[in-house]
């Protein structure tokens, strides 16, 4: 049966379109390269122990004074706030393209604290009939409407064709079909969103990739209830070798938003509409499209939706969060208990090893020997020929060991090397205890 050359038209009959172009080829899978492009897990960097004066980088951070903690907190909080702000601006409130079908009603609900203006730009056919409404509160979804489209098709082999419909929750779609090619069949699907359509195009024979999937022949109809507001694609596909002729009648019972109380409406006189969002006010916008038009096989409408951020809100939020964390950090540092090691007098840079017995060389030597005994853990036992090196600095092997660490008391380095260890690592190389102070030993 051939396609009719002319189609009857009347005011009561739905728009009828003869489809001769606009078909797409299916994407055959199996040509992937086989590479897995997922990110590799991050490398784990092992920590190095202290060896002969080398310092672990992570230990340098531990030695920072408590006076630097608030500034570190400021840097961390500022970085976190900037990351969250960029995520909101580029992600949740980033620029997106909205595809609508006939009689669409798309709700836009910006957050008034972070959004100052809603900008909608018409793409594609200029003057297509899109209208942007502004309301003081979210409108009711209670306006019922019906429309239908009839399409005559001659689907080539290994091709498909689709029609977009933006449907709100509570709508209903009925698709009637009549396959005129005897002994032939087509795939008829209803896919949710671009992702659902793309999955079906990659493998048309899989029934679990779309909301509705049928193999049609002869005549009949399918129905589908809509439970989520989104864009939906009604598509037919031919994976066989011969061309298939068919008639597709799409009937929609839609639910639209009520825009009778709108205080703002814009019909895109300059291909762009800007809706100002009041601060701390309930606001909503609705983008609508006209009904189906005759001799328009697609009835598609495209608009670019973007948001102008309210920068002052981001700055104030960052300041408040930073101030709160600084206060919490300050209170936490003040309430930390003072340990016994921190009570050591650190203002006395030079002090005798044994108070009251500075003139007693034998007592000083006895105490000095007892300190040096503990260094065998680091140096190990040496022969008599190496006894002279046991009293040299274990770091530079040049100067004598003339200092010890508080609070552990180990003596393994000269005063210069010991000071450098305290300033860089901050931990005793023998027992790994934190160095509170480096005391110099004077031979009197």
From Swiss-Prot:
Keyword annotations: Membrane, Metal-binding, Transferase, Transmembrane, Transmembrane helix, Ubl conjugation pathway, Zinc, Zinc-finger
Topology with respect to the bilayer: Multi-pass membrane protein
Major subcellular location class: membrane
Signal peptide: none
EC number in record: 2.3.2.27
Tissue distribution of the protein: Expressed in the shoot apical meristems (SAM), root tips, pollen and inflorescences.
First and last residues of each zinc finger (RING-type): 393-432
InterPro entries (alphabetical): APD1-4_M, APD1-4_N, Znf_RING, Znf_RING/FYVE/PHD
Transmembrane segments: 74-94, 312-332
This protein's GO CC annotations: endosome; plant-type vacuole membrane
Pfam families xrefs: APD1-4_M (PF16041), APD1-4_N (PF16040), zf-C3HC4_3 (PF13920)
Compositional bias (Low complexity): 1-15
Localization annotation: Endomembrane system
Residue ranges, compositional bias (Basic and acidic residues): 17-41
Highest rank taxon of the organism: Eukaryota
Region (Disordered): 1-41
Catalytic reaction annotation: S-ubiquitinyl-[E2 ubiquitin-conjugating enzyme]-L-cysteine + [acceptor protein]-L-lysine = [E2 ubiquitin-conjugating enzyme]-L-cysteine + N(6)-ubiquitinyl-[acceptor protein]-L-lysine
PANTHER family: E3 UBIQUITIN-PROTEIN LIGASE APD2, OS05G0521000 PROTEIN
Name of this protein: E3 ubiquitin-protein ligase APD2
Gene: APD2
